[in-house]
Amino acid sequence: LGLVVVDEQHRFGVEQRDGLRGPHGELPHRLVMTATPIPRTVAMTVFGDLDVSVLDQLPAGRQKISTHVVPLAEKPGWASRLWSRAREEIDAGHQVYVVVPKIGDVGDDTEEGVQLFGDGGREGAKSSDGKIRLTSVTAMNAYLQDVPALSGVRIGTLHGRMDAAEKTRVMTAFERAEIDLLISTTVIEVGVNVPNATLMIIMDADRFGISGLHQLRGRVGRGGAAGTCLLVTRQEADGISRERLDAVAGTTDGFELSRIDLQQRRRYSGGRAVGT
């Protein structure tokens, strides 16, 4: 083996890269690519004898992506505007992703689960133990079925517990514009290309890391129309979570986001760049 080309470099771990060694420990030439550098990538660049080439232009045919933080703790009334905004995109002939951090638990499709979104703010989102309940595919699907602004909209769901055939069926339907709004977990993060999708709404965006958010929003704006990503959070304005969201909203430069990520780890995690 003489040359290895690795796309989505940030998706591979140390052991997977170590598996490329030859029988006598020799390494092939490597070309690694990523649009989403992570602190481990920075460490490899500094200490791993990598030469760096930066492409700072959008690929041909891609449009800019605008990203905005939607702070429901301060602006609970903005919750209803999310779905009006989604309807505007759908009426314009486009499609929408709604990304959530979990698949669902027993009861998420009941009235109790739907109350998760009742007033858009923190109080309607708390469970019996006082913690904010994370948005799930199950609860979001149940909720959106009754949102007046989305009346008549074809809604689909996608998550990792579905078998491969069912996931393929759903994604094919979305690619063919047979689904207008797709509720999904992060299974769409890599390898999904639907040029007609122009809006992504990420619920509980504070539960995702910088690189994950940057990777997710790259699913929109892949065609002739500009993309928009809305980072929805119920966390208060102060704290590292909101700082992270503001950073993602402030730039689409993956290397700058990696620098910010590393800086935050230095401040809040004792400088750990690659976890434990």
Regions found by a protein language model. Name each.
Residues 39, 61, 105, 164, ...:
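Flexible, glycine-rich phosphate/dinucleotide-binding loops
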Residues 74-95, 102, 118, 122-123, ...:
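C-terminal helicase module of SF1/SF2 nucleic-acid helicases/translocases
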Residues 9, 33-38, 46-50, 58, ...:
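A short beta-strand-to-loop transition that corresponds to the Sensor-1 phosphate-sensing loop
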Residues 46, 56-57, 69, 100, ...:
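Pocket-edge structural micro-motifs
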Residues 2-68, 74-91, 95:
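Post-DEXD/H (motif II) to motif III coupling segment of the RecA-like Helicase ATP-binding lobe
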